Amino acid sequence: MSDFDIYTSESDLSQLKDLIKQCGERLVIRKGECFLRAGEIGGKIAYIEQGGFKCVRKDSRGNERIFAFMFEDELIADYIPYRNKKPVLLDIQAMEDGVIYCTPIENLRSFFETEIDGDIYVRKFVETIAYQHLQRIVSVVCETPEERYIQLQKRVPDIFYRVNLKDIAAYIGVRPETLSRMRTSFLRKDSTENT
C-alpha cells in the first residue's frame, strides 16, 4: 500500500474538515511548493480550500510517476507513515497556487480521544485510505488508459484547465503525445454524437 492519504468528500468527514479549518493554520501555497516531501517524517493533515495537489515520485529513470490528484474540499495527510513512524514515500506538491488549512495530526489527538465518535473518524480515515488505494491499484492493473482518462474527466471536469498534459499523461500511464491523440479522439467522438 502506498503512503499518500487522500480523504474525499465521499465519506462523512465534514466535522473533521471543520475542525481543521478552525484549529489549522491558513497557508498560501505556491505552485511547485511541497506540502510533504519524500523522506520526511511528517504528521500533518490539511484541508484544501483552494488549489490542486499531486502525489508524485520519480522512478529509476527520472520520470515522474503521479499516484493521485487532490483538489478543493479534500483532505491530504501522511497519516499511515506517521502512525507507523515511517518516512513519507511521495511528494505532495502544489500544481497551482492555493490555500490550505494545516495542522499537526497530534493536535487532533484530543479530539479523537474525547469525542464520542472519535474512533469512528479514525476508522473512516483508514477505510477511506484503503478503499482509495484499492481503487487506484485496480485502475492501474485492470483498466485501459482510455478508461482512466474517462474516470479522471468525470471526477474533475476542468482537469485540462488546471493540470498540465504531462502530469495527466503520467497519471493515466501514457506519453503526452498519446494523451493528446486520445483527447482529440474523445473530442471528435463527442462532437459527432452531439450533431
Question: Could you tell me what each predicted segment is?
Answer:
Residues 35-40:
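Short phosphate-coordinating micro-motif centered on Lys-Gly-acidic
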Residues 129-139:
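Short, Lys/Arg-enriched N-terminal segment that forms or immediately precedes the first helix
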Residues 143-195:
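Phosphate-/nucleic-acid-contacting segments
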Residues 59-65:
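Hydrophobic/aromatic-rich structural module bridging two neighboring secondary-structure elements via a short loop
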Residues 25, 34, 52-57, 75, ...:
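Short beta-strand segments in beta-sandwich/barrel cores
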Residues 32, 43-54, 72-73:
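Glycine- and acidic-residue-biased ligand/ion/polar-headgroup-sensing regions
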